[in-house]
């Protein structure tokens, strides 16, 4: 029964449950014209949500699917530039990142400069509207403030995970995000 946590939309990936295998998901641009890739199912729903909000160009994808190699490069770069404490707080070890499933997306509010590791995605304005509708499109804010002890990850208000509409709604209703 516990084997199910390693597959499907509810796949659990973290330091205790590293990703299994190197199967690349079917990918698509996270939003039209974007070079950031996402699982095609998640990309379609993200496009629908951003379109509904008329927020194309305001909400921008920063990071989606990552290969093992890319995750290693991000880890190594952050260690050099930010140090070990920061890196352990905000960057997952290779094999332990939800991004490697293609189901996770880091989003930002459009700005001249966007921080790749901690992009700005505030709780008001169009970003707040995004959050209010996210579950209806299958997304949850994965690492909420106050849940660090449960997730083992620092709060990341920019990080959204596609789990599918019924799961996202249930998780929102029961406070499981």
Please annotate each region the language model reported.
Residues 1-64, 68-177:
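Extracytoplasmic cell-surface/polysaccharide-interacting catalytic and binding patches
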